[in-house]
Structures are given as structure tokens and as C-alpha cells.
From Swiss-Prot:
This is Sex-regulated protein janus-B. JanA and janB regulate somatic sex differentiation. The gene is janB. GO terms for biological process: cell differentiation; sex differentiation. Substrate binds at residues 42, 110-112. Keywords: Differentiation, Sexual differentiation. InterPro entries: Janus, Janus_sf. The active site is at 69 (proton acceptor). Gene3D superfamilies: Janus/Ocnus (3.50.20.20). Changing residue 72 to V: In strain: kenya_2. One of its GO terms (molecular function) is protein histidine phosphatase activity.
Length: 140
């Protein structure tokens, strides 16, 4: 009988942890993997994760027509910090996005954050439904 009473306490113990993990994961999965604009832009390859859970992250691509890569990073932080999501920059470069011709060219490096793995960026873009039919070239 004592064992059954002990087992009845398990849902009360597990429930707060379950809510914490599930809401954090929902926030993480809700972040779009790709946001790039039309034309020639700077871009960042970013690993995002919930605070304290660096092992369970995902990689996103963010690009914009700005003066430097730091401006992109600032916009990423403004987007993610209210959700409790942390960001680690993996590198940066440039993207030439031509949606009319269905072509994307990935090249260059970021002076601030170093070079990104352009092949990984290409794979993320190809997995995204918007850019699935695009011809994506990588120049190291």
C-alpha cells in the first residue's frame, strides 16, 4: 500500500518539468529555419537553443541587406530573447538571392564572426520549401 501512495506522487513531481521542457521546445521549433531577403545580402549561420540545453539546438539562417553582420545578430537577439532562446553564431558570409531566376549564390566570410560552413547553409536552404527548386551554388 505504501508503494502505491509513493507512486501517486510521481505525476506531481514530473508535471512541472514536463511543462518546462515542452514549452521551451515549442518555442524552439516555432522559429523559422530560414529568413533571407531578395538581392545581395549578408547572412549568418546561427545555432539556437533554449537556455541551459545547448545539446538540443537547431541551426538557422538569417540574412538581410545591412551594413554589417552585427546588425543581423542584433535583430536575431531581439527576435529570440523574449522567447527564452539563446543564439550562438557559427559564422557568416554573403548570399545573392535571385528569386526570379531561382538561383542563390553563397560566398564570402564575415569579418566579425568568421566564415560559415556554406555547404551546411546550402543544405538548410534546400530543405526549406521556398528554396527547394532553386539552383544553389557555393563558393568557398
Amino acid at each position: 500500500m505504501k508503494m502505491f501512495k509513493s507512486l501517486s506522487l510521481i505525476p506531481r513531481i514530473v508535471s512541472p518539468f514536463q511543462k518546462c521542457y515542452s514549452t521551451d521546445l515549442i518555442n524552439l521549433v516555432g522559429v523559422p529555419r530560414v529568413k533571407i531577403t531578395k538581392g545581395q545580402n549578408r547572412y549568418l549561420l546561427v545555432n539556437i537553443h533554449t537556455h541551459g540545453f545547448t545539446k538540443y539546438g537547431r541551426v538557422i539562417v538569417r540574412g538581410a541587406d545591412v551594413d554589417n553582420h552585427l546588425a543581423i545578430f542584433d535583430s536575431i537577439l531581439e527576435e529570440l530573447e523574449p522567447e527564452g532562446i539563446c543564439a550562438k553564431i557559427l559564422g557568416g558570409g554573403r548570399i545573392l538571392n535571385e528569386p526570379d531566376n531561382k538561383k542563390i549564390k553563397i560566398y564570402g566570410t564575415s569579418r566579425t564572426f568568421g566564415g560559415a560552413d556554406h555547404t551546411r547553409t546550402r543544405n538548410i536552404l534546400q530543405a526549406w520549401t521556398t528554396y527547394k527548386d532553386f539552383k544553389i551554388t557555393v563558393k568557398q
